[in-house]
């Protein structure tokens, strides 16, 4: 009887040793994922004109959706396409925004858990500001295509992935249109600007039935009229946006 038990334990121990590495080191899926969720941000605005400046701030909330393998791929070609919409209101001043972008890149493995990548891409932003002007229905609309470039780093844990990304978006041929009902409208070109951004994302519960993505981001945007007048040369609007995203991946 003791020989039978001894043989049984010997065989099961050998099986456990063979199977254990697959259990302990099993990597999360590298397939592309869809992520849908909510976002919120706090915006600091600073208008500079000559020797004067004015500051204001506004909160925003919205929705986002993206699809790709930027958070899941280990090495090789990576991509992600996304859209988002935001809305903010303060003291009857309204801010509406939309953005769509596409990221393409290449990722290299440093080791089994650490990866770096280079990303290029482009997109389009639309922003409408509706100030409370006591009687006038006024709309200021900005439309800007952009190109982007960034560096990224992924660290893979057992059941989640941390991503850090930093880069810049360069606006191209932006336009601003001011419309006042009952008065008229006018459009001006915006100068091409290079605006930095950074984001940190964490994809959790990757091996579970309901993975969750959470992240923080920062973006600086500068608007300046493309005109040779004294006013245009000395007037610009700076915006610092601090935000978060939380969503489910599927």
Task: Locate each region found by the language model.
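Residues that define the transmembrane beta-barrel architecture of outer-membrane proteins
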Residues: 32-34, 55-61, 77, 94-100, ...
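Membrane-embedded beta-strand positions of outer-membrane beta-barrel proteins
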Residues: 36-40, 75, 79-83, 118-122, ...
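Outer-membrane beta-barrel translocator domains and adjoining extracellular loop/strand segments
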Residues: 46-54, 86-97, 128-140, 173-188, ...
